[in-house]
C-alpha cells in the first residue's frame, strides 16, 4: 500500500522553511483536525513535528466558509499565551501566512492525554480543571485592557464568521421564537473586547501533560 501523502504544498512549506532538508523524505501521517483544518504529523530526521493548514471551506454538510487568515491569529495566540504562561501552547516552529500553514511541536500521545477522552472514560477531577482555569485566568488578566493586544488581535470579521454566524445566528435562522434574543447575544459578544480569548476552550482542545494543560486550536 502506498503511503498517504498530503497536498504538495505541505512538503513545499517544510522545505521552504528549512524544517526538511532537500535530501530528506519526510513521512506524513494524517491527524484528526476537526472540520476546519488539515493537520499532519511529519517525521523528519530525529523528531516529529505537526503541520496545520486552515481550510477555506470547512468539512461540514453545509456551505460554511471561513477566512484562512485565522491561521495567523492562531499562531499569534499560541505565541502570546506561551509568553504569559510558558508551556500552555505548542511551540511554533515556522509560519507562512500566505499559504495559511504553520508548523509546531508534535505532542506525543505517549506523553499526554486529551482531556475529552479522559472525561469520556469517566476520569474527571477538580485539580486539572482548576489548573486550566488558572492558566486562562492568567492570560486574561495579563491582556486585559492592553491596547497593543487589542490592535494585534482585531479579528472582528473572522470571529463573526467562525464563532457567531454559524452558531448563534444560524440557530436564530431556524428558531424564530428566540431569534431576537440570539441576535442580541451575538451583538453583545461581538462588542465585548476586554481580554484576549482562546475562542474555543473545550476539553477536545486541551491536552493533559505532566507540566499542566496545553491549549490547542485557538480561534
Language-model features, listed with the residues they occupy:
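Juxta-kinase regulatory segment immediately upstream of eukaryotic protein kinase catalytic domains
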Residues: 1-28
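Active-site catalytic-loop/activation-segment of kinase and kinase-like phosphoryl-transfer enzymes
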Residues: 1-7, 105, 138-188
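Short, well-ordered amphipathic alpha-helices
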Residues: 11, 76-79, 181-182
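Short Pro/Gly-enriched beta-strand edge/turn motifs at strand-loop
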Residues: 19-26, 74, 162, 180-191
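Residue-level signal for beta-strand positions within conserved beta-sheet cores that form or flank
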Residues: 21-24, 47, 88, 211
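Short, structurally constrained coil/turn elements
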Residues: 22, 83-86, 190, 209
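Active-site acidic catalytic loop and adjacent metal/ATP-binding pocket
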Residues: 29-45, 49-51, 184-219
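ATP-binding pocket architecture of kinase catalytic cores
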Residues: 31, 36, 40-147
Amino acid at each position: 500500500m502506498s503511503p498517504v501523502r498530503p497536498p504538495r504544498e505541505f512538503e513545499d512549506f517544510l522545505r521552504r522553511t528549512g524544517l526538511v532538508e532537500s535530501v530528506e523524505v519526510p513521512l506524513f501521517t494524517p491527524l484528526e483536525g476537526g472540520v476546519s483544518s488539515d493537520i499532519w504529523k511529519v517525521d523528519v530526521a530525529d523528531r516529529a513535528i505537526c503541520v496545520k493548514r486552515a481550510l477555506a471551506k470547512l468539512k461540514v454538510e453545509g456551505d460554511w466558509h471561513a477566512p484562512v487568515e485565522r491561521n495567523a491569529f492562531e499562531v499569534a495566540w499560541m505565541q502570546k499565551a506561551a509568553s504569559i504562561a510558558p508551556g500552555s501552547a505548542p511551540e511554533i516552529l515556522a509560519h507562512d501566512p500566505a499559504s495559511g500553514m504553520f508548523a509546531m511541536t508534535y505532542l506525543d500521545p505517549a506523553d499526554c492525554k486529551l482531556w475529552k477522552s479522559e472525561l469520556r472514560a469517566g476520569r474527571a477531577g477538580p485539580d486539572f480543571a482548576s489548573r486550566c482555569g488558572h492558566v486562562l485566568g492568567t492570560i486574561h488578566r495579563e491582556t486585559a485592557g492592553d491596547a497593543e493586544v487589542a490592535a494585534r488581535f482585531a479579528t472582528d470579521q473572522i470571529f463573526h464568521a467562525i464563532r457567531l454566524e454559524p452558531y448563534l445566528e444560524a440557530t436564530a435562522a431556524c428558531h424564530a421564537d428566540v431569534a431576537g434574543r440570539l441576535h442580541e447575544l451575538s451583538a453583545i459578544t461581538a462588542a465585548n473586547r476586554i481580554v484576549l480569548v482562546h475562542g474555543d476552550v473545550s476539553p477536545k482542545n486541551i491536552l493533559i501533560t505532566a507540566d499542566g494543560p496545553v491549549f490547542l486550536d485557538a480561534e
